[in-house]
Amino acid sequence: MFNKVLIANRGEIAIRIIRACWELGIKTVAVYSEADKRSLHATLADEAYCIGPAPAAKSYLNIDAILNVAEKAKVDAIHPGYGFLAENAEFARAVKKAGFEFIGPNPDAIEAMGSKINAKKIMKKAGVPLIPGSEGAIEDIDEAIEIAEAIGFPVVVKASAGGGGMGMSVAYSKEELKEVIESARNIAKSAFGDPTVFIEKYLENPRHIEIQLLGDKHGNIIHLGDRECSIQRRHQKLIEEAPSPIMTEELRERMGEAAIKAGKAINYDSAGTVEFLYENGNFYFLEMNTRIQVEHTVTEQVTGIDLVKAMIKIAAGEELTLKQEDVKIRGHAIECRINAEDPLNDFVPCPGKIKLYRSPGGPGVRIDSGVYGGAEIPPYYDSMIAKLITYGNSREEAIARMKRALREYVIIGVKTNIPFHRAVLEEENFLKGNISTHYVEQNMHKLREKMVKYALESRDLYSVVSEKVFEKNKKIAAAVGGLTMYISQIMKENEVNNKEW
């Protein structure tokens, strides 16, 4: 087992990894940017080093700076968390070349899934179901029109190197297709440095369901069940749950088998996720995330398996002790991503200082957070404040606990999307499990009224707290003022006494 691990990340995931390391008896090293010098992860770790200015390109994406700290701190391994360098094959190779273990999959697996076109070719060969579309890059508009007419409009044009919905556009006719392809290429070139695009059949109302994998360096690979991730905004997940409300044992077995085929096709040897789109009884490969997912928490809650500790053990060379038949799904878990953003203003990010912070608790409540009262939410990174997770014996109990926990949650100083989550958890379609990746835009008109109500509750709470703080501060100010006058008088008397002496 490792003696010391560097965490090349920030926020809640850095703290999650620190906790896993401590439970395994491993010392931790944090890295932080100048904007994060007072961050919780930097304070919590056994050692912490500044790696550069606030912009991620000069700090959390600075491979040389991270490796210099790893060498200085004499670590054994590096965990990338998610985001930043987590799915960068060159970083994984650089870590190994420098003599450290990379706590994640082998670089070849990362690289294989980094290109969507390449990933589709691998999945087709492995027998994993694919969305109908082009087999490779689109070279010219005539070819694109021919493919689109063969599979039927609407079609979606995607960037091969893309992620998070960037470089993705829908065309409903051949007249639209040319413009959409040009736009997608320009966005892909600007965002990813690669203008390559491809075409797929556009699924009108799919669900986003993913399968959690766990593989080791000895050829073993298992799946840990499914997660429902359909509640999204601009292809960014907001609410996740395990298992999916529509999941059956038969469907889970089929999707699990497909995910394992995907993992085996690239010799996968860590925690990873195979994402599928599901519609009308069929599921199709979307992409594979070669890292720990933000939403790994709900899988941990329903399986009892610590995924971060498993990643560390696998990287240290340990063999999986679990067999597929050992994995049991018990109960239901839901995760709400608590972000510093305004859901009533198109979810615009709201960086700033948290003036008061009180997290919820009670039965079945877990919170993975990287903040505290007085902490700054900087504008340079993702706006996520925390992940709120609830667990219950049933979906209904998990929802009831989440509603309670959201009601208890107090964050004052920055706007958050808590009103959005509270509104969703009362909406009829969500409660029935009738959701898709278009849920937010399809139901926003219904959600808005309740979001306003809950936002006003937050504002009223802020007013009450501010008034109490003001009254308290007035008393403190008066006490300090009196003490200052007293000290000043003593100092004057001392000056007189000293002079006389």
From Swiss-Prot:
One Pfam entry name: CPSase_L_D2
Keyword presence, ATP-binding: yes
Domain Biotin carboxylation positions: 1-445
SMART domains: Biotin_carb_C
PROSITE patterns on file: ATP_GRASP, BC, CPSASE_1, CPSASE_2
Recorded metabolic or biological pathway in which this protein acts: Carbohydrate biosynthesis; gluconeogenesis
One GO term (biological process): gluconeogenesis
Annotated catalysed reactions: hydrogencarbonate + pyruvate + ATP = oxaloacetate + ADP + phosphate + H(+)
Effect of pH on activity: Optimum pH is 8.5.
Highest taxon listed in the record's lineage: Archaea
Record has Ligase as a keyword: yes
Binding positions for ATP per the UniProt entry: K116, E200, H235
Enzyme class: ligase
One MF annotation (Gene Ontology) recorded for this entry: ATP binding
Regulation of activity: Inhibited by magnesium, when its concentration exceeded the ATP one, and by high concentration of ATP and alpha-ketoglutarate.
Enzyme Commission code(s) on record: 6.4.1.1
InterPro entries per the UniProt record, alphabetical: ACC_Biotin_Carboxylase (IPR051602), Acetyl_CoA_COase_biotin_COase (IPR004549), ATP-grasp (IPR011761), BC-like_N (IPR005481), Biotin_carboxylation_dom (IPR011764), Biotin_COase_C (IPR005482), CbamoylP_synth_lsu-like_ATP-bd (IPR005479), PreATP-grasp_dom_sf (IPR016185)
Thermal properties: Optimum temperature is 80-90 degrees Celsius.
Cofactor: Mg(2+); Mn(2+); Co(2+)
SUPFAM superfamilies linked: Glutathione synthetase ATP-binding domain-like (SSF56059), PreATP-grasp domain (SSF52440), Rudiment single hybrid motif (SSF51246)
Segments forming domain ATP-grasp: 120-316
Active-site residue list: R291
Function, as annotated: Pyruvate carboxylase catalyzes a 2-step reaction, involving the ATP-dependent carboxylation of the covalently attached biotin in the first step and the transfer of the carboxyl group to pyruvate in the second.
Quaternary structure and partners: Heterooctamer of four A and four B subunits.
NCBIfam families: accC, PRK08591.1, PRK08654.1
Name of protein: Pyruvate carboxylase subunit A
